[in-house]
Amino acid sequence: RFKKIRRLGALPGLTSKRPRSGSDLKNPLRSGKRSQYRIRLEEKQKLRFHYGLTERQLLRYVHIARKAKGSTGQVLLQLLEMRLDNILFRLGMASTIPGARQLVNHRHILVNGRIVDIPSYRCKPRDIITTKDKQRSKALIQNFIASAPREELPNHLTIDSFQYKGLVNQIIDSKWIGLKIN
C-alpha cells in the first residue's frame, strides 16, 4: 500500500497509515516530463486504489457515467461516492474503505432495516444506515467511532453516533470529495 501511496500521492481511503518520510511523496527526481498517457493512467489508478475497485468495475462505472447527463467526471465521482463502503468510511464508521468493505461483507450493516452484504450497493437519498443489533457489531462500530479523529462530516450525510445510525440526505456535492483528480 505504501508503494501505491508513494507513487500516486495521498490516498485517504486506502490506509490510515502514512509513509515515514513526508517529503518523499511524489519523488521529483524520477519524474521528468509526464506524457498525457501517464497523467491519465495515474489518475485512473488513483481512483481504482482509493475506492478499491477492479479494472472492470471502474470501466462499468465510467460506462454508466457517460450515459448520464452532465459532466462525465462529476457523475463518475458521485457514483463512486454513493457506494455503501465509501459512505461508511465518510461517516467515520470505518477507518478505511477496505475496513468498511469488511464490515459490509461480514453482514454488520443494515440499510433501511435490511442486511446488505454488497459493498458496492448504491445508496440513495434518505437511506438509513445502521448496525445490526448484535453486541459484536455495535462494539466494532463503537471502536471505529471512538478511535477515529473527528473530521468534518460532508453535508450530504448525518450521523447519530449514540444509536450507530447514519443518514444519506442527498447526492454528494463535488467539493466534499477528498481526492484530487485531474
Swiss-Prot record:
**Which organism was this protein described from?**
Scadoxus puniceus
Instruction: Report whether RNA-binding shows up as a keyword of the record.
Output: yes
Biological role: One of the primary rRNA binding proteins, it binds directly to 16S rRNA where it nucleates assembly of the body of the 30S subunit.
Localization: Plastid, Chloroplast
Family, according to the entry, reads as follows:
Belongs to the universal ribosomal protein uS4 family.
Ranges for domain S4 RNA-binding: 82-143
Cellular component, GO annotation: chloroplast; small ribosomal subunit
* SMART domains recorded: Ribosomal_S4, S4
Query: Partners and quaternary state?
Result: Part of the 30S ribosomal subunit. Contacts protein S5. The interaction surface between S4 and S5 is involved in control of translational fidelity.
Name of this protein: Small ribosomal subunit protein uS4c
